[in-house]
Amino acid sequence: MKKAEGTIISAISGYYDVEIDNKVVRTRARGVFRDRKQKPLVGDRVVVQLDDQGMNYLIEILPRINEIGRPAVANVSRVLLVISAVEPDFSLELLDRYLTFFAWKNVGVVIYLSKSDITSSERLKDIQTELEYYQRIGYPVFEDAEKLENELPKMIDKDQIWTLAGQSGAGKSTLLNQLESEAKQVTGAISTALNRGKHTTRQVTLFKYGSGFIADTPGFSAIDLFKIKVDDLRNYFYDLKEASANCKFRGCQHIKEPGCEVKKLVEEGKIARSRYESYLKIRQEISDNRMPEYLKK
């Protein structure tokens, strides 16, 4: 029997739709996965045993890079992080929490500022100034949906999987629907084969976008940072990590240690004070195993 590698793009009631060479193949999982306590996830790269009679089986799950979200998506390369300018209000602290979480998961982030068109020009200018810092430390930032839609297909490499994240009400579903509508005009075959409805279930599917995929889910808004080791947190603030190479002590936690390059650059305005304050606040919460204030509301 022929074997082929592909990507799971949908999982419903024990059936797995796998994209192999731009075609969708419906499969079942062998019992061996249950015996190994392995569960195939949307996004998994898998080996499929193909049968001329249509009885196709998953026989191997290839090693995962990561898994994120609820329900989980495997092998996510990048996240499109939707941050609202207003309703809900823009929050640097929340932005830093998301960036920390995805750095921990080893996932790249592209920031999209939504609702900029209903924000006062004065407030928007302040937000744009704050986001310029994030661009300087390596995060792409978009605030124009049309420009994002033009650039996004070029940014998604072959077989990469992207998903969306952001707080509730930020506009993730609206953006996702726009992207999916555009994608269906280009690759209608796969979308039709899946026969998906609107976002009324907790199922996840992938739709083809550019050379890769976007997860068809409104994403997730809650993030859990408590599993990060407190002394490792500094490594997930990339600007702090870069500066720490010049700290006096190798294990500097950038709190009270003498000769701390991070604190020096904060005082000089070269590292955003808000970033440093986010680091200290998250570090204290992890240390105390304390729920952040924004989740108590």
Swiss-Prot record:
The keyword Ligase does not apply. GTP binds at S114, K115, S116, D117, G166, Q167, S168, G169, A170, G171, K172, S173, T174. GO terms for cellular component: cytoplasm. Keywords: Cytoplasm, GTP-binding, Hydrolase, Metal-binding, Nucleotide-binding, Ribosome biogenesis, RNA-binding, rRNA-binding, Zinc. InterPro entries: G_CP_dom, NA-bd_OB-fold, P-loop_NTPase, Ribosome_biogen_GTPase_RsgA, RsgA_GTPase_dom, RsgA_N. Residues 65-223 form the CP-type G domain. It is an enzyme of class 3 (hydrolase). The keyword S-adenosyl-L-methionine does not apply. CDD domains: S1_YloQ_GTPase, YjeQ_EngC. Zn(2+) binds at C247, C252, H254, C260. Belongs to the TRAFAC class YlqF/YawG GTPase family. RsgA subfamily. Monomer. Associates with 30S ribosomal subunit, binds 16S rRNA. This is Small ribosomal subunit biogenesis GTPase RsgA. It comes from Lactobacillus johnsonii (strain CNCM I-12250 / La1 / NCC 533). The lineage of its organism: Bacteria, Bacillati, Bacillota, Bacilli, Lactobacillales. The gene is rsgA.
